[in-house]
């Protein structure tokens, strides 16, 4: 992946929408999660058939190249996140942090045991606002489905705005020193609360309202 310039590298990873040139990316294994293996095989085949639109790579092939994963996600509009052994994948959070719309394939990924609302109710209270849930009838041609969404500029703006709002609340190493010192990140980051701030605030509100014992 090439260099997009100093402005791209100095901005928070969830910014830089103008640098995105890849429709979708999938980084993972076909065999991870026996129940979802057919879905993963289908996704990989769909990506391999349309290489100009989709980046696909084995997680093992780049497991020691974290920056490569970040670069791919930062250049992609959509990040394909089929469920594995659990509904919620780490890649979903990597995608959000990089401003890449998580593409989900099961309603369980939006709720229920292991889903967003239960595990991350304070950090991601409205996961549907920043993700795409692909209907089962469109999963065999997921890139065609996403291409239609990408052409809807208003919807894309809403998705990207939701990602920018949520991403700072998922990290702990928030660049507050940059904000205080007027560094390169100050204008974009605006010193939003980080993950710990959000958790403590949510717990305090729950205690006040009697929702947390």
Language-model features: locations:
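Conserved active-site segments centered on acidic
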Residues: 1-49, 202-203, 207-211
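Donor nucleotide-activated moiety binding/catalytic core segment of transferases
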Residues: 9-19, 38-101
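Membrane-interface amphipathic segments in extracytoplasmic regions
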Residues: 58-59, 66-67, 146, 171, ...
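Short, solvent-exposed turn/loop segments enriched in Gly/Ser/Thr/Pro and often Arg
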Residues: 59-60, 107-109, 199
